Amino acid sequence: MTGLSPSGDIKPLLDDESQRPRVITPFPSPKLTDLSMFQGEHKESLYWGTYRPQMYFGVRARTPKSLVAGLMWLVMKDGKPVMRHFCENSNDLKSFGWKEHNGRDFGRQELFEQNMVLETSFVKSEEGSLGYGGDWSIRINVQNMLNDDEVKRSTHLFFYLADEGCNGVNLGKDVLRLKESSVLASGSRQDVGNWQMHLKSQNHLETHYCGFKTPDIVNLSGLVQQNLTAQEEKSGLLQLSDSSEDSSNIYVFQISTTNQSTIDIAFVSGIKEETSNMENRIMSLTGLPLSSLLEEKHIAFNAKFNECFNLSDKLDPETLVVGKAAIGNMLGGIGYFYGQSKIHFPKSPLAKSEDDFLLYWPAELYTAVPSRPRFPRGFLWDEGFHQLLIWRWDVHITLEIVGNWLDLMNIDGWIPREQVLGAEALSKIPKQYVVQFPSNGNPPTLLLVIRDLINGIRTEKFNEADRDKILSFLDRAFVRLDAWFKWFNTSQIGKEKGSYYWHGRDNITNRELNPQSLSSGLDDYPRASHPNEDERHVDLRCWMYLAADSMNSIQEFMGKNDILVTEDYSSIAKLLSDFTLLNQMHYDKDHGAYLDFGNHTEEVRLVWKEVIHEDGHLSRELVRETYGKPELRLVPHIGYVSFFPFMFRIIPADSSILDKQLDLISNGNIVWSDYGLLSLAKTSSLYMKYNSEHQAPYWRGAIWMNMNYMILSSLHHYSTVDGPYNSKARTIYEELRSNLIRNVVRNYDQTGIIWEHYDQTKGTGEGARVFTGWSALILLIMSEEYPLF
């Protein structure tokens, strides 16, 4: 079997050294996460954390087989008890999210339930700790919102401990008759030694428990509900069975209360008989000392927020609350995952099979996530936008996260765009999106972050120690970044010199009005109606310009000119910034807009037809019908893609074409609204059109924060450089910035949520809830912090 190498040479699909297919062979260079800066104190300080973003509240360590903790609770729905555990986008929890989180050792979250408010706080302490990673505490505040007649209805919380390595967990002696302070559970692990979990509360609590021996933590809420149902059938009481299986590695503790309650749960490790200061350690992690510690962390969070973003004198208190929620939820959404991606690899060229995949090597990923309820896993192009915010808060976290992603690169320079690692991540994704295709890329947004870091060094934003760490990181990262660019510059190249197109569009489907381009990140944004190799995508061309220019900057900054690199980055960047060539390929003079090019007709629509399946079954389905012959042409859809040359500042400041872009941006009949810029022009034939029977419009009109941020960034740029249009750019910039901030704050005031995207006509939040991936960029818009080019 043979395949095309990144250089265009024919190479065996099997790597000679390992006899593994190349697609699942790691890139042969030292891993970034093995750098000394990520070891020692740094590694230990980040060992424990709220690294289970898919849970309403969960704690784990950054190790594959961790001791994990989590919280569940019961609510009544349609007269039946329902367990809250995994974050759900569809349930009727009013709102939830981190109000504060520093990404390291502190976070405070509020969850607004039907008749209850839960506040969960997490804090770590190294004072007196002997175990690796330190001690930590959880505080759960329960506030019932019931009236006097209902107040006696119990609130049922379920706190659990589970050992993923199936090490036995020991039940505490006083679980059923809690004292002021009681041991819930204990055990021993190789990483942290002997450990104990203590519960302390001044309130009257009723407790029950059950223990399970199973590696299946994903279905824990189901096991608990089965136990509750069985007990209710026996006794009529909604309580756990107070029993456990032999050698249980999971214990669930039911904590019931009818009053307002504060529950402190402390984890201590590294316990040795000769160090009998347990009472002092527990006291320092509970009660008044815990209150003092949480207040200290709260004050420090606010101080750092002011230091990083300098907003206290610029914005009103309501807007500041949203800014803090943006960074708090971004940092609180950082997760740790471990597992193996599934990579598409056809077993036979003649027939498709569900087994047409190979497993990537076992890998860990430390990353932020776009949305805890909808997308609690790593997405490659999202992560670049995430880190534009995070590096300003904690550059060490950014370096490690970017390093984690680059370490996922295979020998050909490809990185899977969506990371589904481990059973918990797998449980939260539709089956059709699990397998990753090695022909498909994703925008190289990580280079936006790396450019920012280099510019930060040039403008002396970092101290000497951090500067040295960034330089050390870039020195090791360069060979991987070089391979990544090489993969793009060969696998995604078009027919014409200087042209590119996103591979992976379905050219045989008749179920989509316009075949999606998932690899572009813009999914259903309209492209050429009939995908083929003649396509030219203006957004990818601009991403490649960014990549080439970034690599050239890194090469010059790091003095890498004396080493062998695969590309002449200076020449490629010059080619892709050639304004005349760009206009020849993509500019439509009639509309004053940059457009894709491809085999296209506007004469397509979805129609209902009766379809006979292979088994003889007859069904009525929406299928695409084409009524006009497609031809090679510019694709007449104005929207976010049209503004990429503007976003990447390829347009000269004195060009009349810049004036045309400003007119398009500010035209209320095109993409302008009082809430932000629309993803697709109102004049487009596919504006707000369904792409299939079940695919609602996604990037066909809705307002998305990442693209608004990039456009706003360039408006800011063009407003500050010399040129005939700078005052016009400034006026548009100020109004767009004001519209975006006002709308996000208004929605947050009404719903307590930052949303995935916003409605194009009303500005209401839509899509995934708690989308504090790139929607959190609203904080950088507030602080007017933009990437430099």
UniProtKB/Swiss-Prot annotation:
Alphabetical keyword list: Glycosidase, Hydrolase
UniProt cross-references to InterPro entries, sorted A to Z: 6-hairpin_glycosidase_sf, 6hp_glycosidase-like_sf, Glyco_hydro_63_C, Glyco_hydro_63N, Glyco_hydro_63N_sf, Glycoside_hydrolase_63
Alphabetical GO biological process terms: oligosaccharide metabolic process
Molecular function terms, GO-annotated: Glc3Man9GlcNAc2 oligosaccharide glucosidase activity
Enzyme class: hydrolase
Pfam families in alphabetical order: Glyco_hydro_63, Glyco_hydro_63N
EC number: 3.2.1.-
Transmembrane segments: none
Spans annotated as Disordered: 1-24, 512-531
Pathway: Glycan metabolism; N-glycan degradation
Active-site residues, Swiss-Prot/TrEMBL: D523, E756
Domain of life from the UniProt record: Eukaryota
Family in the record: Belongs to the glycosyl hydrolase 63 family.
Protein name, entry field: Alpha-glucosidase 2
Encoding gene, per UniProt annotation: GCS2
